[in-house]
Amino acid sequence: VQMPEESAIRLLKDRYGMTGALKRFDTEKDDTFRVTTEDGRRFILKVANPDEPFTEIDFQNSLLRYVETRDPTLPVPRINDTEDGVDIFQIKDVDGSQRCVRLLTFLEGTPLDETQSDKTGRVQIGKMLARLRYATEGFTHEAEDRYYGWDVQHLLTLEHLLDEVDDYTQRQALSQGLERFRHIEVKLRQCRKHVLHND
């Protein structure tokens, strides 16, 4: 059940003591709103899907806090606690489902899919990913072994979705990529790993 905007506004006021204009983002499964306060500050209010366990949300918050201590200048969202000092709280939705709620800072910028890819941009992305990799080194959490289809180590589990790609050229390119991956998968399993979201 999609959370009504009025409910999100009430959560902001009751738990964070703030008011502002909301813009809903289209997401895969959560209710996500950009909040713009009267003084121009921006935040992201995330209301997790009822199927998302608390441990997963805690994993994400713990990782963000860990990164902040390892590389404070790395541009990742910062967590905002409620007025009573809680970083995640649960609500009961209109259908009785439990949902986790949290407030993060909003990162200004242009989404990658709206930019032109050039060598300079790719180098900058590579540098940022390297910083993120080092900032996450050593992080552990009880939920770190969760399964995500887009995690590279599970790439072949998506092979059955190739038939869903209508464009023949794109489907062939994806198929060839999966075939190349099949040959390196064994070597990949032998590599050292640490927590990485891959999103």
Question: Language model features by range: what are they?
Answer:
Residues 38-140:
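ATP-binding pocket architecture of kinase catalytic cores
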Residues 99-102, 153, 176:
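Generic alpha-helical secondary structure signal
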Residues 28-40, 44-45, 79, 182-199:
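Active-site acidic catalytic loop and adjacent metal/ATP-binding pocket
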Residues 4-12, 141, 156-198:
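An alpha-helical support segment within catalytic cores of ATP-dependent transferases
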Residues 83, 114-172, 192-193:
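A cross-family kinase active-site recognition segment
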Residues 23-26:
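Protein kinase glycine-rich loop
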Residues 12-19, 71-75, 188:
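Short secondary-structure junctions
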